[in-house]
């Protein structure tokens, strides 16, 4: 089954079956954000349950 190239670049499937994603708001207009905010945004997030099926079909 073919996968969407855009989704392939943005999401990764973990061994436990969750989908990893990057946080938004990380690069543009970063100087006014606090250090704590930028540090938390650096970490990987997971796709929410409501979006899981839709994104799972793309990858």
Swiss-Prot record:
Q: Biological process GO terms, please?
A: translation
Q: Does the keyword Ribonucleoprotein apply?
A: yes
The record's keywords, sorted A to Z, are: Ribonucleoprotein, Ribosomal protein
Entry's Pfam families?
Ribosomal_L35p
An example molecular function term from Gene Ontology annotations:
structural constituent of ribosome
**Source organism superkingdom:** Bacteria
Gene Ontology CC entries for this record = cytosolic large ribosomal subunit
Q: Which InterPro entries match?
A: Ribosomal_bL35, Ribosomal_bL35-like, Ribosomal_bL35_CS, Ribosomal_bL35_sf
- Stretches the record annotates as Disordered: 1-22, 30-49
Q: Where is the composition biased (Basic residues)?
A: 30-43
Task: Provide the family line.
Answer: Belongs to the bacterial ribosomal protein bL35 family.
HAMAP family, alphabetically? Ribosomal_bL35
Q: What is this protein called?
A: Large ribosomal subunit protein bL35
């Amino acid at each position: 089954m073919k996968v969407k190239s855009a989704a392939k670049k943005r999401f990764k499937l973990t061994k436990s079956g969750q989908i990893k994603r990057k946080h938004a708001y990380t690069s543009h207009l970063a100087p006014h954000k606090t250090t704590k905010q930028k540090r938390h945004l650096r970490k990987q997030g997971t796709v929410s349950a409501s979006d899981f099926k839709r994104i799972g079909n793309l990858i």
